[in-house]
Amino acid sequence: MALYQRWRCLRLQGLQACRLHTAVVSTPPRWLAERLGLFEELWAAQVKRLASMAQKEPRTIKISLPGGQKIDAVAWNTTPYQLARQISSTLADTAVAAQVNGEPYDLERPLETDSDLRFLTFDSPEGKAVFWHSSTHVLGAAAEQFLGAVLCRGPSTEYGFYHDFFLGKERTIRGSELPVLERICQELTAAARPFRRLEASRDQLRQLFKDNPFKLHLIEEKVTGPTATVYGCGTLVDLCQGPHLRHTGQIGGLKLLSNSSSLWRSSGAPETLQRVSGISFPTTELLRVWEAWREEAELRDHRRIGKEQELFFFHELSPGSCFFLPRGTRVYNALVAFIRAEYAHRGFSEVKTPTLFSTKLWEQSGHWEHYQEDMFAVQPPGSDRPPSSQSDDSTRHITDTLALKPMNCPAHCLMFAHRPRSWRELPLRLADFGALHRAEASGGLGGLTRLRCFQQDDAHIFCTTDQLEAEIQSCLDFLRSVYAVLGFSFRLALSTRPSGFLGDPCLWDQAEQVLKQALKEFGEPWDLNSGDGAFYGPKIDVHLHDALGRPHQCGTIQLDFQLPLRFDLQYKGQAGALERPVLIHRAVLGSVERLLGVLAESCGGKWPLWLSPFQVVVIPVGSEQEEYAKEAQQSLRAAGLVSDLDADSGLTLSRRIRRAQLAHYNFQFVVGQKEQSKRTVNIRTRDNRRLGEWDLPEAVQRLVELQNTRVPNAEEIF
C-alpha cells in the first residue's frame, strides 16, 4: 500500500497532457513493484542485522575531528550526522556527506570503529560531487516513473550531473518535455525522500535489476567482490557506490539544462540512449546566482567570440581540428612568441621532431600498452610486402605500423640518446611546439577545449638529481611569470606516490621531498593530493582561474623515473661513471588552442593590446583624408601592429566610431583635415576614452612600447 501511495502522491497535474509514458498509469508497473518490494525486504533484514550487531558489541570508539578534537561514539550505532548535531546545528544543516578515514561516507551510516572524521559541505569539490550525484538519482527517479525509462548511468560531473536512460529504439526525449521533467524533479525534492544504503550480494543484485539489461551488464563487469551497494530513494532503487545526501529535501534548487543522445557500448551493438543534464544547489538563491553567472559565461563562450570576431571555425570534414583564420592566427602566434621569448632567456632550446613514429617507439615508452586507444595508427602503403633485400638501411621501406604522436616525450628521449652525453650539458631543456594528435571520442569534442589535433608549449628537462630542486623552482617561476602577464590566478597541488607506482620507494621519497621544498620556497599556497601522482613519478598540477572564477588545468610539472630507464638514458658524470638523468615534463600553457579559448572567455573578446587581433582602426573623417589615413595605417603595419582602415563613406563618423568600439579595437585613430595638415592622429580607446591629438610617429612608437611590454591595460596607461 505504501508504494501505491508514493506513486499517487508523485503524479502531477498536466502530465497526461504532456504525453509522458506513464503519466496516465494510476499504478506502478509490475517490475517496479517487485523491485521495490525486494528492496524493502532486504532493507528490513539489514536494519535488523545492524541492530543485532550494535546490541552484541556495545563498545565505545574514538572519533578524531580536524583540529585534533576527539569525540566518543558507539560502534554500529552513532552516525556522522548525530556527531554533526552535537558539534553545531549549522554544521548539521550544511553537511552533505562525511569522510571517514579519507573515504566518502553517508551521514546516516553508523560508524564502525575508531576513525578520523571530516564533514563535507557543498562548498568543497567532494561535497559538490555528492550533492550532484544525489541530484542525478532524483532525475533518474523522475525519468523512470514518468518517461518509462530504463536507467543506465547517472554520474556527477565537474559542473553538475546527467543521467543516461533508454526509451526504446524510436523514442527520444523532446526539449519541450524538459520543463515538465524538471517540475517532477522539484516535486521529488520537496517530498524530502531519504536515501537508504543497502549492501546486497551479487545474486540479490541480479534479482533487483533483472529487468534492466544495462544494470545487469554493470553488475557482471564492475562488481568484483561478494557484495555491492544499492541506494533506495522513494520508488527508485539504483546500483550505486554512494555516498548520498540524507534526503532529497536538501536539494533547494534544481534545473535541467539540456537533452541529447549518447551511446551504450558493450559486447553487442551499441544502443542509443537519451541524456538529460542538469545542475542543482542547496538553495534557490544559489541557483539564481548561478543562472546569472551562466548567462555571462554564454556571452563569453569562446566559440561565440571566435565566430563573431572571425578568429577560427570548425568543419565536419576535419572533426576535432581547428581552422585558424588570419585574426585568430595573430592571437595564436602572439602566444607562441611570448613563450619563445621566455624560452630564450630561461635556457630552453627549441627542437622539431617527427609527427609519425613506428609503434615500436610507443611500445618502448609504455604508451602503446596504456594509451593505444587514444592514438591514431596508420598502415603505410606496401607494408604487407617485405622490404627488398637489395635496399640498404637508408632506403628500406619501413613496414611497421605507424602512429601519430600524442605527446613529445619519447621523441625527446631519442634526441637525448642519439649521442653520448656529458654532465656538462645538463640541465638539457628541450622545447617542442610540434602538432599532437589524440583520438578523442566525438562526443567529448567541444570547441577549443578538447581537440584531436593541437599544439602544446611542451618541454622536457634532463637534469641530475642535484639540479632537480633548482629546475623545479625555475619551472614554478616560469608559471608565475606567464600567468601574471595573462591575468590568471592559480592554485598548485602536489600529487604523490600512488599505490601502483613503479620504481624505488626511496627515490620517490627523495623526489617528493624536493618538490615539497620547492613549493615551500615558492611561497604560493598549495594542496597535497596524497596518492594521486602518476605511476611513473610525482607531479605538481596547476589550476588557473579565469575571470569568471572557473578552474582550468593547463600547466603541469611532472617528474618521470620510468622513461630514462625504458630508453636507457645515460650521461657521463664528473667522476667518469655513467649515470641516469632525471626527466621533468613541463608545460605552462598546455594546449595552446585550449589556452586561447580560456583567454577569449576570460577577456570576453576584449583582448589586451599585445594579443589583440583588433589593435588599431584608422578612421578618416571624409574622403579627402582617406589617403592620409592609408599612410597612417601603413606606418602602423610597418611597426608590426595590426591596423585596419574604415573609410566607409556610407556611414557617419559617429557610426564608424561606434562600430569600432563594438568590434573591440583597442585604439581608434581619427584623422580629419586638421590632423592631415599637422601629420597627427586623434586617438580614442575602445571604452571611448579620448586621448587627444598625437604626432603620428610618436603614437606608433608608444603603441610598440606597450605591445612589447605586454601590459594588460594599454588603453589606460597610453
Swiss-Prot record:
<dbReference type="InterPro" id="IPR012675">
    <property type="entry name" value="Beta-grasp_dom_sf"/>
</dbReference>
<dbReference type="InterPro" id="IPR045864">
    <property type="entry name" value="aa-tRNA-synth_II/BPL/LPL"/>
</dbReference>
<keyword id="KW-0067">ATP-binding</keyword>
<feature type="domain" description="TGS">
    <location>
        <begin position="55"/>
        <end position="121"/>
    </location>
</feature>
<keyword id="KW-0648">Protein biosynthesis</keyword>
<dbReference type="Pfam" id="PF02824">
    <property type="entry name" value="TGS"/>
</dbReference>
<keyword id="KW-0496">Mitochondrion</keyword>
<dbReference type="InterPro" id="IPR018163">
    <property type="entry name" value="Thr/Ala-tRNA-synth_IIc_edit"/>
</dbReference>
<dbReference type="GO" id="GO:0070159">
    <property type="term" value="P:mitochondrial threonyl-tRNA aminoacylation"/>
</dbReference>
<comment type="function">
    <text>Catalyzes the attachment of threonine to tRNA(Thr) in a two-step reaction: threonine is first activated by ATP to form Thr-AMP and then transferred to the acceptor end of tRNA(Thr). Also edits incorrectly charged tRNA(Thr) via its editing domain.</text>
</comment>
<dbReference type="InterPro" id="IPR004154">
    <property type="entry name" value="Anticodon-bd"/>
</dbReference>
<feature type="modified residue" description="Phosphoserine">
    <location>
        <position position="52"/>
    </location>
</feature>
<keyword id="KW-0225">Disease variant</keyword>
<dbReference type="GO" id="GO:0002161">
    <property type="term" value="F:aminoacyl-tRNA deacylase activity"/>
</dbReference>
<comment type="similarity">
    <text>Belongs to the class-II aminoacyl-tRNA synthetase family.</text>
</comment>
<dbReference type="GO" id="GO:0005739">
    <property type="term" value="C:mitochondrion"/>
</dbReference>
<dbReference type="InterPro" id="IPR047246">
    <property type="entry name" value="ThrRS_anticodon"/>
</dbReference>
<comment type="subunit">
    <text>Homodimer.</text>
</comment>
<dbReference type="GO" id="GO:0006435">
    <property type="term" value="P:threonyl-tRNA aminoacylation"/>
</dbReference>
<keyword id="KW-0597">Phosphoprotein</keyword>
<dbReference type="InterPro" id="IPR012947">
    <property type="entry name" value="tRNA_SAD"/>
</dbReference>
<dbReference type="GO" id="GO:0042803">
    <property type="term" value="F:protein homodimerization activity"/>
</dbReference>
<dbReference type="Pfam" id="PF07973">
    <property type="entry name" value="tRNA_SAD"/>
</dbReference>
<dbReference type="InterPro" id="IPR002320">
    <property type="entry name" value="Thr-tRNA-ligase_IIa"/>
</dbReference>
<dbReference type="GO" id="GO:0005524">
    <property type="term" value="F:ATP binding"/>
</dbReference>
<keyword id="KW-0547">Nucleotide-binding</keyword>
<keyword id="KW-0809">Transit peptide</keyword>
<dbReference type="InterPro" id="IPR036621">
    <property type="entry name" value="Anticodon-bd_dom_sf"/>
</dbReference>
<dbReference type="Pfam" id="PF03129">
    <property type="entry name" value="HGTP_anticodon"/>
</dbReference>
<dbReference type="InterPro" id="IPR002314">
    <property type="entry name" value="aa-tRNA-synt_IIb"/>
</dbReference>
<dbReference type="Pfam" id="PF00587">
    <property type="entry name" value="tRNA-synt_2b"/>
</dbReference>
<keyword id="KW-0030">Aminoacyl-tRNA synthetase</keyword>
<protein>
    <recommendedName>
        <fullName>Threonine--tRNA ligase, mitochondrial</fullName>
        <ecNumber>6.1.1.3</ecNumber>
    </recommendedName>
</protein>
<dbReference type="InterPro" id="IPR033728">
    <property type="entry name" value="ThrRS_core"/>
</dbReference>
<dbReference type="InterPro" id="IPR012676">
    <property type="entry name" value="TGS-like"/>
</dbReference>
<dbReference type="InterPro" id="IPR006195">
    <property type="entry name" value="aa-tRNA-synth_II"/>
</dbReference>
<dbReference type="InterPro" id="IPR004095">
    <property type="entry name" value="TGS"/>
</dbReference>
<keyword id="KW-1274">Primary mitochondrial disease</keyword>
<keyword id="KW-0436">Ligase</keyword>
<dbReference type="GO" id="GO:0005759">
    <property type="term" value="C:mitochondrial matrix"/>
</dbReference>
<dbReference type="GO" id="GO:0004829">
    <property type="term" value="F:threonine-tRNA ligase activity"/>
</dbReference>
